[in-house]
Amino acid sequence: MGISRDHWHKRRATGGKRKPIRKKRKFELGRPAANTKLGPQRIHTVRTRGGNKKYRALRLDTGNFSWGSECTTRKTRIIDVVYNASNNELVRTKTLVKNAIVTIDATPFRQWYEGHYVLPLGRKRGAKLTEAEEEVLNKKRSKKAEAKYKARQRFAKVEPALEEQFATGRVLACISSRPGQCGREDGYILEGKELEFYMRRIKSKKAK
């Protein structure tokens, strides 16, 4: 039959049936959902009205995520889908849709933070550093550079809930792009009240 976005196949408000006034038209068509899954990248192009293109992501495993309070964006790996307000089935099947809550790899953000502020983030006391990390955090710097980093460090506060996540190496994020339409998986790191809310929801779901 084909998926149609018309309204004349529905009954009237009174409950009476409508007579079809015409056959289905091309401009009323609908397409099946992409149901983007977590996996090695696979994107199909779809020709749309006007000769335009949509990018139908069938599988994705990376995306650009922004850290709002620090005004920085990094490309990182998506690890898992943990919550979806609309449907638990989408969590079970690891389907990536807009507004899904996912866990992402925290490493690119930690590397940026430690390079920008010269402060450790989410590290246990006395944890061994690699040579590269040692060089970033304990490098000998000029007085001018030291003053620059000291000035930055005044604003280097990270909320405790987020710091705990950095210690585990995974951060909760929300997807804000539409992977079935634009073929990308972009979003933002959860912070503040929003992070508290979703952590409560995930906890209550696990308790069931």
Swiss-Prot record:
It comes from the Eukaryota. Keywords: Ribonucleoprotein, Ribosomal protein. InterPro entries: Ribosomal_eS8, Ribosomal_eS8_CS, Ribosomal_protein_eS8_euk, Ribosomal_Se8/biogenesis_NSA2. Residues 7-26 have a biased composition (Basic residues). Gene3D superfamilies: 3.10.290.70, Ribosomal protein S8e, subdomain. GO terms for molecular function: structural constituent of ribosome. GO terms for biological process: translation. PANTHER family: 40S RIBOSOMAL PROTEIN S8. NCBIfam families: eS8 (TIGR00307). This is Small ribosomal subunit protein eS8. It comes from Apis mellifera (Honeybee). The gene is RpS8.
